[in-house]
């Protein structure tokens, strides 16, 4: 997203409208969505405002609107960015992965994979980060959404030790979605889908291709 141009939205609702506009501009009638973290908030809002565009949904490392535990994201982000600066590590090493030795090894492997290719993006601008944190804070303080009429197949995956977005929110949100399946990866954190990348890729492919 660092290479993107234009004005960055500072609300989940506006981000969702922008995403819907992009999907329609590309000429797609129906899409599968994978929403990770803040992207999961955006995906939930798209389910509400444009359900006709969506085939199946994967939500990963995210949480429901109105979960006040999500307000801690800014504090944790700043703290881990500070730790990363002093230890000369990628912030994701702290943000995405628990403190266990196995998780840290898998986290380092993920970061190494992302660094294999160069010139894919630009560093995220501070203005973008601040806009995202404002959007997250508003989401945490919002009214819970009603998904009782949403019949889309939804697969929810998270780790059991998500520092950024409380893992308990995964259970709450999956209960709100009538046709949702929740899988919790043991010993994984906010970056569960990266920590268990091979397993997630197989399961996600099976989910998206089911009934074809």
Report each predicted region and the residues it spans:
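Conserved alpha/beta-hydrolase catalytic His-Asp/Glu region
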Residues: 89-141, 145-146
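Flexible "cap/lid" loop of the alpha/beta hydrolase fold
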Residues: 48-49, 55-85
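Catalytic active-site module of serine/aspartate enzymes centered on a nucleophile-bearing elbow/loop
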Residues: 180-212
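Short beta-strand immediately N-terminal to the catalytic nucleophile in serine-hydrolase-like folds
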Residues: 33-35, 60, 157
């Amino acid at each position: 997203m660092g290479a993107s141009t234009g004005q960055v939205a500072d609300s989940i609702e506006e981000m969702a409208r922008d995403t819907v506009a992009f999907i329609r501009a590309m000429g797609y009638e129906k899409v599968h969505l994978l929403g990770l973290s803040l992207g999961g908030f955006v995906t939930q809002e798209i389910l509400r405002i444009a359900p006709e565009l969506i085939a199946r949904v994967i939500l990963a490392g995210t949480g429901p609107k109105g979960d006040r535990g999500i307000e801690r994201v800014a504090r944790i982000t700043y703290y881990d960015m500070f730790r990363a600066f002093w230890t000369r590590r990628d912030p994701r090493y702290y943000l995405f992965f628990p403190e266990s030795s196995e998780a840290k090894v898998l986290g380092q492997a993920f970061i190494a994979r992302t660094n294999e290719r160069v010139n894919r993006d630009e560093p995220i601008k501070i203005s973008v980060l601040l806009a995202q944190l404002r959007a997250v804070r508003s989401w945490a303080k919002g009214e819970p959404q009603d998904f009782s009429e949403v019949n889309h197949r939804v697969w929810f995956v998270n780790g059991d030790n998500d520092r950024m977005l409380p893992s308990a929110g995964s259970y709450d949100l999956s209960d709100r979605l009538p046709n949702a399946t929740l899988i919790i990866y043991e010993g994984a954190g906010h970056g569960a889908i990266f920590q268990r990348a091979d397993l997630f890729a197989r399961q996600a492919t099976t989910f998206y291709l089911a009934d074809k």
